[in-house]
Regions:
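The beta1-alpha1 cofactor-binding region of Rossmann-like NAD(H)/NADP(H)-dependent oxidoreductases
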Residues: 60-71, 103
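Substrate-binding pocket helix/loop in short-chain dehydrogenase/reductase
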Residues: 97-98, 102-107
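Conserved glycine-rich cofactor-binding loop
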Residues: 9, 16-17
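Active-site helix of classical SDR
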Residues: 121, 156
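Residue(s) in the substrate-gating loop at a strand-loop-helix junction
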Residues: 140
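SDR active-site lid
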Residues: 173-237
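Conserved glycine-rich Rossmann-like NAD(P)H-binding loop of the short-chain dehydrogenase/reductase
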Residues: 30-47
Length: 269
């Protein structure tokens, strides 16, 4: 990778683990200055201890709270003076049939996945405009094709992509690059922490994490997509097929998706 990220100030939400942590691990050797946030003080402290001699700024933040997002962005600006790239990575998933799920599941998922991105982008936007910077949303194939058992998650990703497309158009003349990335199934904690029907962490993954793309590989794809100024990037071949089939043959896509997630009438994935 070129010197594109050298001395760039990159703000990443949800950087204490998973894809966010992998992005930090990849960006630090490239000479980027990084600000990140997460809900866990301990995880952020461990991250800070891992990188004691680099430009890494961490802030305990719950992105579902607008004031927390404002403080994270302001703290980043106070520390580095500006923001070149904002990666809205923080996210939460869910696993429950709609008929069983409490409506609080929808509120919590939307608050993190959609409104967290809106809040951080809103407060970072003046700096991003002045720097002709980059806004990135970490989305999912669920932003193209609604997934059973993930209705709230799918809704949040459809909302994210629609909003990003709208502001991309608004910001065209201001030279701010807006994009989203759909990683596909990536080995991380997101399925363990996914909300159940009662809006509580389900505590275990229902899928084989070892067969998935690694967070490090995902981060590499994301950074290359940013450098190439892509409008969007779907990272796995399977997800590219899903998007294409859903666009061209939606009824067939319904059946294929149902058969993947259900066995014997029960949600198994």
């Amino acid at each position: 990778m070129s010197s594109f990220f050298t001395n760039k100030v990159v703000a990443i939400t949800g950087g204490s683990e998973g894809i966010g942590k992998a992005l930090i691990d990849a960006l630090i050797p490239l000479g980027a200055k990084i600000a990140t946030c997460g809900r866990s003080f301990d995880k952020l402290y461990n991250l800070q201890m891992q990188y004691t001699n680099v430009m890494l700024h961490t802030v305990v933040t719950d992105v579902s709270k607008e004031e927390d997002c404002r403080k994270f962005i302001q703290s980043t600006l106070d520390t580095f003076g500006h923001i070149d790239i904002l990666i809205n990575n923080a996210g939460v998933s869910m696993r429950a049939l709609f008929e069983d799920a409490d409506t609080d599941v929808f509120r919590k998922v939307m608050d993190v996945n959609f409104f967290g991105s809106v809040y951080c982008t809103k407060y970072a936007l003046p700096s991003l405009i002045s720097r002709q910077g980059v806004i990135v949303g970490i989305s999912s194939v669920a932003g193209y094709r609604g997934l059973p058992g993930r209705s709230a998650y799918s809704a949040s990703k459809f909302a994210l992509q629609g909003w990003l497309e709208a502001i991309r158009t608004e910001l065209l003349e201001k030279q701010v690059h807006v994009m989203w990335v759909s990683p596909g199934f990536t080995a991380s904690n997101i399925r363990v922490a996914a909300l159940d029907a009662n809006a509580q962490s389900q505590g275990a993954s229902t899928m084989d994490e070892t067969a998935m793309m690694s967070a490090a590989e995902c981060a590499d794809h994301i950074l290359r997509a940013i450098e190439k100024r892509k409008r969007s990037a779907v990272l796995t071949l399977n997800d590219k097929r899903t998007v294409l089939v859903n666009r061209l043959f939606p009824s067939w896509a319904d059946k294929l998706t149902h058969n993947f997630f259900f066995k014997g009438g029960k949600l198994v994935k």
